[in-house]
UniProtKB/Swiss-Prot annotation:
Homodimer. Interacts with GTF2F1. Interacts with WDR77, SNRPB and SNRNP70. It is found in: Nucleus; Cytoplasm, Cytoskeleton, Microtubule organizing center, Centrosome; Cytoplasm, Cytoskeleton, Spindle; Cytoplasm, Cytoskeleton, Spindle pole. It comes from Mus musculus. One of its GO terms (cellular component) is centrosome. Residues 453-463, 566-578, 854-864, 934-947 have a biased composition (Acidic residues). This is RNA polymerase II subunit A C-terminal domain phosphatase. The keyword rRNA-binding does not apply. It catalyses: O-phospho-L-seryl-[protein] + H2O = L-seryl-[protein] + phosphate; O-phospho-L-threonyl-[protein] + H2O = L-threonyl-[protein] + phosphate. GO terms for molecular function: RNA polymerase II CTD heptapeptide repeat phosphatase activity; Tat protein binding; TFIIF-class transcription factor complex binding. One of its GO terms (biological process) is negative regulation of cell growth involved in cardiac muscle cell development. The modification Phosphoserine is found at residues 530, 664, 730, 830, 860, 863.
């Protein structure tokens, strides 16, 4: 029988940890026969507290022998009953003795309610109560107050413990670390130890690159391990307890951890992903849960400071970039928006609307529509990527694994063994055969090549390194590719081989590059496009099962698609990143300094225990302790220098930042280093005259930060010709290093040496559009309207010495004995020759001219031409004796009637500006109209004709 709730039972607003009282139930008295619990015992709901008996004639008062004298009628009426608890808790006090008769409603037991110190997915691990299904009388949900608020297990955020128990566990962890002389190291993945991209770069070597998929239909991910990564982890693991903390998804984090630590000796279960993050924009919120006693023994390495809120125990790592155009694929949304302004990312895969607007989720990490950014290497919906509606802490079951990973299945032995997935020979991912590309894969590689041209890298050094790596590596030979194919023909299978062949379908020698490539590529792209728009469809269902696959799928779903025989023949990898070597030295210094102070603390030489949050800034501030720096050109003059990144890191390294340049070597506030962005500023010119002042580039400061050491200033000199280099590379300026004086880009008129016979020239009436004259070009030289000075330097269109060979076949040969003059100067190249990309070719222009001539010449007939001939003769005879000023070049009117003239602008090598033809037609029309008026008006004097001609000439000269 269950005791009814007494008056002392906690109400809805009373905390569950308050004491509860169990009273005697029913309207009849009970005799207590036996207690089933003792003081301090833990009871659950339904646990038996005591065994009682009831008697109808039993009297609650009087001595026991007197009550027993009533005889067997009482014994016959009594019935044993079990008193059960309807609450969980700990027995605080037993309020009755065995054999005592308890009146109805009398107090029997005082209980201390369960505080639910350990809760797993809403169930109390102590009392078993479901804390999510309690309903109050009025229908509102009544959730008992639980003290379990701390999640201490990395990959199981649903397991909560109380703060008291968390502190107890935290103290035990600290004692264990002190016994083992270790510290804690929080390790970031993306752009710290690895670099991941969705883009396949066939030009790059496959050495050290893992190719894998996180799910069926998901895009292939390519991960490159940073050089010296595994050696770094193995050495540091002897001094630090390694914890992984990444903004990638849980499956992504465990997969990468399987590459770095296949035997699970380095990280074990200490892997924290985005799915367990309390704050999606910061990593500091989880430190309180993981280390309830404080993070005084925790050191952090990450390439970004903002996600840690510039924590003092953070060691900033140089960003690792191997794939050009890709930053941190798992950066938080705030960093995506920043990186989207600097990058242009065109991807062929679709994504959700949020990620299309935010670009990268790293660094360095949304996507600009219609492209796709590499958020965690997946085209998932934003709700799932941020842990919206997906159930955290779950993984596909083994039944669903066979369906979800058909292309990456492997035996459990291969994944659980201590060997890396690179030991079995596999098919290479790239599909080049005999120097040709598989037709089905060619569009994908073409897109990748287009993306390489559109990407805007964050720095020039990264761009140059990536381009040099791409150029220096080649694809494996076709013979080596064919050798690897028969090895997969048997029933044996490896995870790496499946993962490597997954982009192409099923692995095996049956794949032919010409008959299967197109179909497989079409099928793959169709699956990707259809699955990328599903939102929370199959992926949510896949994550809503169980998390029992944490350790298995990291080795099953992915593998390094490297054929060892192919890798031996490839060129050496040109990735010379050695930052982890310097980072190892820094971590060793931190570890040594900590335990040196800890030993002194044990000997009571120090009053307080050492703290990593004080040791890291202390060691860092000694790097540039004797340096005073001043900045030039790194930030706008109206921007406070204290808010710049250079000022933050310079002061963190111990340098003193000055704002005024003091040139006196004896001044106490003089600067020792000038960090300038460009040469030519006033500060740089003054500093270069001082021998005691080092003028360096900003790379010197970043190198000191990366190594925690003062590097040599001679390695980072300030380049003096930064401005000149930028001016020469400008597309708007033609390079002319031989000219000294500033010159104009274009001359008003071209200068021709002499006339050359051309095919033909046609002259049309500007008013009627009819053909006036056509014929071969004459040999009369064209006078120059504005001859150049001989001493004038060459301009944009002048032929440079290195360009004379280019135009040598078209330059006229000078005659012997002739004096050089304006008419004999070598011609300048035309627009089509100097800038061929900005003009049409000669054949196109000639075909356009002929087409226009045919259209305009259809209406003209022979009578019109013959009618114009006597008028032209009269006009030329009248104008012949008159003194004339030199005409603009390219205008010819001195041709006799019988000899048709030709213009030199039709000559391929002598093409002039296009406006000359229009101006020639205008002059012809004006001359003809003036000739007609002179014939009609015989009284007009010659002086008026001269004035009109002079005015016309002046107007033409102004136009030219």
């Amino acid at each position: 029988m269950e005791a009814p709730p007494a008056a002392g039972v906690p109400t809805e607003c009373t905390p569950a940890v308050a004491g509860a009282e169990v009273r005697c139930p029913g309207p009849t008295p009970l005799r207590l026969l036996e207690w089933k619990v003792a003081a301090g015992a833990t009871v659950r709901i339904g646990s038996v507290l005591a065994v009682c008996e009831t008697a109808a004639s039993a009297q609650p008062a009087g001595p026991a022998p007197a009550r027993a004298a009533s005889g067997g009628c009482v014994r016959a009426a009594r019935t044993e009953r079990r008193l059960r608890s309807e609450r969980a808790g700990v027995v605080r006090e037993l309020c009755a003795q065995p054999g005592q008769v308890v009146a109805p409603g009398a107090l029997l037991v005082r209980l201390e309610g369960c505080s639910h110190p350990v809760v797993m997915k809403g169930l109390c691990a102590e009392c078993g109560q479901d804390l999510t299904q309690l309903q109050s009388k009025n229908g509102r949900q009544q959730v008992p107050l639980s003290t379990a608020t701390v999640s201490m297990v990395h990959s199981v955020p649903e397991l909560m413990v109380s703060s008291e128990q968390a502190e107890k566990l935290g103290r035990e962890d600290q004692q264990r670390l002190h016994r083992n002389r270790k510290l804690v190291l929080m390790v970031d993945l993306d752009q710290t130890l690895i670099h991941t991209t969705e883009q396949h770069c066939p030009q790059m070597s496959n050495k050290g690159i893992f190719h894998f998929q996180l799910g069926r239909g998901e895009p292939m991910l390519h991960t490159r391990l940073r050089p010296h990564c595994k050696d770094f982890l193995e050495k540091i693991a002897k001094l630090y307890e390694l914890h992984v903390f990444t903004f990638g998804s849980r499956l992504y984090a465990h997969t990468i951890a399987g590459f770095l630590d296949p035997e699970k000796k380095l990280f074990s279960h200490r892997i924290l992903s985005r799915d367990e993050c309390i704050d999606p924009f910061s990593k500091t919120g989880n430190l309180r849960n993981l280390f309830p006693c404080g993070d005084s023994m925790v050191c952090i390495i990450d390439d970004r400071e903002d996600v840690w809120k510039f924590a003092p125990n953070l060691i900033t790592v140089k960003k690792y970039v191997y794939f050009p155009g890709t930053g941190d694929v798992n950066a938080p949304p705030a960093a995506r928006e920043t990186q989207a302004r600097r990058k242009v990312n065109h991807s062929s895969k679709g994504g959700d609307a949020l990620e299309q607007a935010l670009s990268v989720r790293d660094p360095e990490d949304g996507r600009p529509a219609p492209g796709v950014e590499h958020s965690n290497g997946l085209g998932k919906a934003s709700r799932e990527l941020n842990g919206g509606e997906a159930v955290p802490g779950v993984f596909p079951s083994k039944a669903d694994e066979k369906e979800a990973w058909p292309l990456t299945r492997a035996s459990p032995a291969s994944s659980s063994s201590g060997h890396e997935p690179t030991e079995a020979p596999e098919l290479p991912v790239s599909c080049e055969w005999d120097g040709r590309t598989t037709p089905g894969v060619q569009p994908t590689q073409g897109d990748a090549a287009t993306q390489d041209l559109d990407f805007d890298l964050s720095s020039d050094s990264e761009s140059s390194e990536s381009s040099s790596r791409s150029e220096g590596q080649r694809a494996p030979a076709p013979q080596e590719r064919t050798k690897a194919a028969p090895e997969h023909s048997g029933p044996q299978d490896t995870s790496g081989g499946r993962a490597a062949a997954s982009p192409l379908g099923e692995s095996g020698p049956s794949i032919h590059p010409h008959d299967k490539g197109s179909d497989l590529d079409t099928q793959e792209e169709g699956e990707r496009d259809s699955l990328c728009g599903l939102g929370n469809g199959s992926v949510d269902r896949k994550e809503a099962e169980t998390e029992s696959q944490n350790s298995e799928q990291s080795g099953v779903t992915a593998g390094e698609s490297l054929d060892q025989s192919v890798g031996e023949e490839e060129e050496e990898d040109t990735d010379d990143d050695d930052h982890l070597i310097h980072l190892e030295e820094i971590l060793v210094r931190v570890h040594t300094d900590y335990y040196t102070k800890y030993d002194r603390y044990l000997n009571k030489e120090l009053e307080e225990a050492p703290d990593i949050r004080k040791i890291v800034p202390e060691l860092k501030s000694k790097v540039l302790a004797d340096v005073a720096v001043i900045f030039s050109g790194l930030h706008p003059t109206n921007f406070p220098v204290e808010k710049t990144r250079e000022h933050y890191h310079a002061t963190a390294l111990g340098a003193k930042v000055l704002t005024q340049l003091v040139l006196s070597p004896d001044a106490p506030d003089r600067a020792t280093h000038l960090i300038a962005a460009r040469a030519g500023t006033e500060k740089v010119r003054q500093a270069q005259e001082c021998k005691h002042l080092h003028v360096v580039s900003p790379d010197w400061l970043w190198s000191c930060l990366e190594r925690w050491d003062k590097v040599e200033e001679q390695l980072f000199p300030l380049i003096d010709d930064d401005t000149r280099t930028h001016r020469d590379n400008s597309p708007a300026v033609f390079p002319d290093r031989h000219s000294v004086l500033p010159t104009a880009l274009f001359h008003p008129t071209p200068i021709h040496s002499k006339a050359h016979p051309g095919p033909e020239v046609r002259i049309y009436d500007s008013n009627t559009g009819k053909l006036i004259r056509m014929g071969p070009q004459g040999s009369a030289p064209a006078p120059s309207s504005a001859p150049l000075n001989h001493g004038e330097p060459s301009s944009f269109r002048a032929v440079q010495p290195h360009q004379q060979q280019m135009f040598g076949e078209e330059l006229p040969e000078s005659q012997d004995g002739e004096q050089p003059g304006p008419a004999r100067r070598k011609r300048q190249p035309s627009m089509s020759e100097a800038m061929p990309l900005y003009t049409l070719c000669k054949e196109d222009l000639e075909s356009m001219d002929k087409e226009v001539d045919d259209i305009l010449g259809e209406g003209s007939d022979d009578s019109d031409i013959e009618k114009k001939k006597p008028e032209d003769q009269d006009n030329e005879q009248e104008r012949a004796p008159k003194p004339r000023k030199p005409r603009a070049p390219g205008i010819r009117r001195e041709q006799p009637v019988g000899l048709p003239s030709s213009g030199e602008r039709s000559t391929p090598g002598m093409r002039g500006p296009r406006g000359h033809k229009r101006k020639l037609n205008e002059e012809d029309a004006a001359s003809e109209s003036s000739g007609e008026s002179s014939n009609d008006d015989e009284e007009g004097s010659s002086s008026e004709a001269d004035e009109m001609a002079a005015a016309l000439e002046a107007e033409l000269n102004d136009l030219m």
